[in-house]
Amino acid sequence: MHLQGTNTYLVGTGKSRILIDTAQKNCKLANQYQKGLPVWINRISSFLYTHKIELSYVLLTHWHGDHTGGVPDLISRNSSLADKIYKNRPDSGQNPITHGQIFSVDGATVRAIFTPGHSVDHMCFLLEEENALFTGDNVLGHGFSVAQDLGRYMDSLRDMASLGCRIGYPAHGAVIEYLPGKLEEYIQHREGRERMMLSALTRQRVRGEGVREEGVKCGLTLNEIVMAIYGKLPPEVIEKALAPSLLQVLWKLTEDRMVGFKPGDPLKRQWFALEQRKRNKVRGCPS
């Protein structure tokens, strides 16, 4: 079943099934555990009642409100479900999910895969009968996802690729008919951006050290990196569309010991490509 903006999956072939993710919370309500979208609970309840289906497990890919918002409504309709909610880093009253944990019902064996990066608690679920992967928000049916921790996210994408699943069931968008290709696209997209940014910083370092022009510096600010890669863009485009993701790349390159920086505001500080011999340093301006 695909309900509203977040895809909700009922998994299994018998009367007892697994539900993966719930609908988004009502945006007018501040608490993510208050009631979600009425249309979602009405549809899912009607489907379960009509087909005489019971839920054995409710699996949540991660904590974001558009995946957990329907939990209170499920419990309000059926209080027995309170003991059947599973999430990595569970909230009060929920059950934990661990990497490799198996959830089984008739026609479906689902294995939990820990895939942090988009969020700290993100899980994917492998449906062994189909060699398919419920990708959560790590890989979408359209466009690209965002990452809270880019380094861990890239590791998770590679872990997902190593599973060899052909089909992907994303939390948003259409079914991914060939998941290996989509994962490769995601990985190449991120790695390509890393290469572009490191190349821009390396060119600036070579220019600053080699030419020794008066006033030429070895590093670049975020805005200058954008200018070097994309040309001149409106400030609002940089601030809202590019800055968050590019800063993530810079932090990852710093953690990978490829880039250093001067202290200060991340948007205004200078970032430097480190020399090979100095890449054992995590931060700082190269001499």
UniProtKB/Swiss-Prot annotation:
GO molecular function: beta-lactamase activity; zinc ion binding
Highest taxon in the source lineage: Eukaryota
Binding site for Zn(2+) 1: H62, H64
Protein's UniProt keywords contain Transport: no
EC number: 3.1.-.-
Membrane spanning stretches: none
Enzyme type, top EC level: hydrolase
Active site: D66
Function in brief: Lactamase-like protein; part of the gene cluster that mediates the biosynthesis of neosartoricin B, a prenylated anthracenone that probably exhibits T-cell antiproliferative activity, suggestive of a physiological role as an immunosuppressive agent. The non-reducing polyketide synthase nscA probably synthesizes and cyclizes the decaketide backbone. The hydrolase nscB then mediates the product release through hydrolysis followed by spontaneous decarboxylation. The prenyltransferase nscD catalyzes the addition of the dimethylallyl group to the aromatic C5.
Family indicated by similarity: Belongs to the metallo-beta-lactamase superfamily.
The protein's name in its UniProt record: Lactamase-like protein nscB
Organism the protein comes from: Trichophyton verrucosum (strain HKI 0517)
